[in-house]
Amino acid sequence: MPNCLRLGMGAKVVDGRIISLAVQEEVSLGVSKLVERGLEPHLAVVIAGEDPASHIYVRNKEKACKNCGILSTRIDLPSTSSLEDILATVEKLNSDPKIHGILVQSPAPQGVDERIIASSIDPRKDVDGFHPSNLGRLVQGDSSGLLPCTPSGIIRILRESKVEMRGSRAVVLGRSRIVGMPMALLLAQQGVDSTVTIAHSRTEGLQELCREADILVAAVGVPHVVKSDWVKPGSFVVDVGISRVEGGLAGDVSPEASHVAGWITPVPGGVGPMTIAMLMSNTLRAAQEQ
């Protein structure tokens, strides 16, 4: 039996908010050292449109910046903004030496290709970690650069929970460039050493595959798709999904799974706070390296 399992006790709920505060304290110390040298880390957030959820996310990021001592600038663009409008804004930020991190809040206006936007950001300022050169470094086994925030936050959650990842079997449910693919790469990297399977809606025997996972990362955005009988007893379940349903918010994992898992991250309050904390960490790193 792998020693990453926790059996017979019911799931321990892993509070991402507590871990995120520890990360933000680390960032705050790093920011203070830079400020002493006359350098103030500065994050620019571009948001196009009036999507309510996006504006909530941006406010949360601004609050985290304030907590960490990071300057933040918000650039609001209309929902009618074209790709060219957004690229022009990004280019101005790329050329501004006082801006160390650039984030274009998703979703982009309808018809605008977010991949082109990600590719337009200076890789040194790409605090989301989505630029092809940063993702390419990860593919090559180099995790020293700016990493996608949600996957790196999940690795931090696993480490803070004292989970032995080496030799574990991990299943990542979802294959997006934002979470699924980079998550699999991070779990497989040298020093983590999990054996990783990427699963998706076309995967045959999906339930059985998930049930074999010592570490299960659910990132598909389908409310409660992962049932309790998908979960290996004592395993570590990371719920990345967040969907609006009648009565509030729901993750990808059904509540009943907590009776089977050894650890589980809640929705909300699990992965979300860690994503923002790692964004702060990336902004600090970007400022240190520019």
Regions found by a protein language model. Give the residues of each.
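Short beta-strand elements in bilobed, periplasmic/extracellular small-molecule ligand-binding domains
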Residues: 43, 65-79, 196-198
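Short, well-structured alpha-helical segments in soluble
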Residues: 85-97
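Glycine-rich phosphate/diphosphate-binding loop of Rossmann-like nucleotide-binding domains
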Residues: 48-62, 145-232, 236, 248-258
